[in-house]
Amino acid sequence: MDWGAYEYHAVSGSWIAKDFRHGSGFEHGLQCIIDPDVVVGDDVRLGHRVHLAPGTRVLDDVEIADDCVTTGISLLGSHVRVRTGSCISKAVIVDDWCFVAAGIMSSHTKNVDHARPQAPKRQLVTRFGYGSVIGSRTNTSAGVSIAPGAIVGYGSHVVTDLEIPNAVYYNDPHPWATLQREIDPDNAYYVEVPESYMPHQFDAELLAKYLPHYRP
């Protein structure tokens, strides 16, 4: 780590990159690390011991609680809430109004050549859809997509796409998340996605820099 790229904030005990850019209303807790090439919007609030890795992009009105990390290029949309101890891994997009509960582990994008140089290079993007709720202690495999308005139950293992929006998923009868029921439009938990809403995407420059082997 090039500590010359950081400034030490003595009051909070945090290391913050000199090129860090943020909007108005930014707040952070104690002992945070914000790496180079991180950009956050307005009214972003970080808890204690939060680590944002290079390539992280955070939009407006986002709360990231204590002991959370990003591990690389990632995008958190507006009005997202990430609760204590969650890991937003490299190549994860969290769309607007998503709630990520405590202790979520999203798997790193695939490019499994760490020990096998001849292995095919392939990088995948994971998506948590608009208004989805990801229950505590959920694990997600690389490259899965969770539909808008989906509710994923506690301790679920998401190994395939959860394709039906406004539906409940959890580990029953298998040890991975499967469809349990759909949510009625008159239910308070039903999420209406605005017709004008466009799911977030990584821009081309970020993809070229951090995910050169990603192919849509």
Provide a role label for each language-model segment:
Residues 1-21, 66-67, 75, 81-216:
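Glycine-rich hexapeptide-repeat left-handed beta-helix
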Residues 12, 29-31:
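Short secondary-structure capping/turn segments at boundaries of alpha-helices and beta-strands
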